[in-house]
């Protein structure tokens, strides 16, 4: 079985860079990123590896909602200028890049689901909780910085909702990290309570007369934002990959 290690490029590199943010020379960062990749390869023993990078095009999410990810700090100039060197250095060590047009998340999700559909296994290396919506026994998510798997069970326990309610939960409660609005006035606690009673976002709105008047007003006023947030949270699984599995296969000595 093909075992594919999929690295969320900017998630990995920016976290490593944040440990020494004032470093002007990119060579040190380059070595630390490569060191992290070597550790990941040794631990997971994949047959294939790719590091997926965000592109410069405006994402469909940003086009749909202008405030999406608003307020995030821009990439430090030294890091931005050195990304090409990092990619080239990793390629020299058999870690090929896959460039997304805009956000890497949808490309990673598409790649992972396509792999498991043909009998492979995908390990996504990222701390982004959005990947928790990809529930499949052969898709795993690894948090490199805490050296642990981000499991569906852990996510359910942390949020207080079932896996199938994950997108509904974020549609109601929002996601401050990505500036996904959710329904104003419906925070995490209320979202959990509503989903325990009504089981889904659709059921909440179809049974709105059974919701307390205070919450019902908030839900009605924020209905368009709930729908918008639901769309923004969902990962796209049909992105064009323009890549061949063979180009990501590791040499026998590395796999």
Swiss-Prot record:
CDD domains: H3TH_53EXO, PIN_53EXO
Record has Transmembrane as a keyword: no
Keyword Phosphoprotein annotated: no
InterPro entries assigned to the protein according to its UniProt record, in alphabetical order: 5-3_exonucl_a-hlix_arch_N, 5-3_exonuclease, 5-3_exonuclease_C_sf, DNA_polI_H3TH, FEN, HhH2, PIN-like_dom_sf, Xni
Record's protein name: Flap endonuclease Xni
Pfam families the UniProt entry points to: 5_3_exonuc, 5_3_exonuc_N
Annotated keywords: DNA-binding, Endonuclease, Hydrolase, Magnesium, Metal-binding, Nuclease, Potassium
GO molecular function: 5'-3' exonuclease activity; 5'-flap endonuclease activity; DNA binding; magnesium ion binding; potassium ion binding
Alphabetized PANTHER family for the sequence: 5'-3' EXONUCLEASE FAMILY PROTEIN, FLAP ENDONUCLEASE XNI
Binding site for K(+): 172-173, 181, 183, 186
Alphabetical GO biological process terms: DNA replication, Okazaki fragment processing
Recorded family membership: Belongs to the Xni family.
Taxonomic path: Bacteria, Pseudomonadati, Pseudomonadota, Gammaproteobacteria, Alteromonadales
NCBIfam families to which the protein is assigned, alphabetical: PRK09482.1 (NF007017)
Cofactor: Mg(2+); K(+)
Amino acids binding Mg(2+): 105
Annotated stretches, region: Interaction with DNA: 185-190
5'-3' exonuclease domain sequence ranges: 162-254
Cofactor note: Binds 2 Mg(2+) per subunit. Only one magnesium ion has a direct interaction with the protein, the other interactions are indirect. Binds 1 K(+) per subunit. The potassium ion strongly increases the affinity for DNA.
EC number(s) given by UniProt: 3.1.-.-
Chain coiled-coil ranges: none
SUPFAM superfamilies: 5' to 3' exonuclease, C-terminal subdomain (SSF47807), PIN domain-like (SSF88723)
């Amino acid at each position: 079985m093909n075992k594919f290690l999929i690295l969320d490029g900017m998630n990995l590199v920016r976290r490593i860079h944040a440990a020494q943010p004032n470093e002007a020379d990119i060579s040190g960062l380059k070595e630390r990123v490569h060191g992290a990749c070597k550790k990941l390869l040794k631990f997971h023993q994949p047959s294939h590896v790719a590091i997926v990078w965000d592109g410069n095009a405006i994402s469909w999410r940003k086009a749909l909602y202008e405030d999406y990810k608003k307020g995030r700090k821009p990439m430090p100039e030294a890091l931005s200028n050195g990304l090409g060197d990092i990619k080239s250095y990793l390629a020299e060590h058999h870690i090929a890049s896959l460039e997304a047009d805009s956000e890497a998340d949808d490309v990673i999700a598409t790649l992972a689901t396509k792999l498991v559909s043909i009998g492979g296994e995908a390990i996504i290396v990222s701390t982004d909780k959005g990947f928790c919506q990809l529930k499949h026994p052969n898709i795993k998510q690894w948090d490199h910085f805490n050296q642990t798997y981000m499991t569906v069970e852990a996510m359910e326990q942390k949020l207080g909702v079932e896996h199938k309610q994950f997108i509904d939960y974020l549609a109601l409660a929002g996601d401050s990290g990505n500036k996904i609005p959710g329904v104003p006035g419906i925070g995490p606690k209320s979202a959990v309570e509503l989903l325990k009673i009504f089981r889904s976002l659709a059921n909440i709105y179809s049974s709105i007369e059974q919701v307390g008047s205070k919450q019902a007003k908030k839900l009605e006023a924020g209905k368009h934002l709930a729908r918008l947030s639901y769309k923004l949270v969902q990962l796209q699984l049909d992105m064009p990959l323009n890549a061949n599995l063979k180009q990501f296969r590791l040499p026998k000595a590395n796999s």
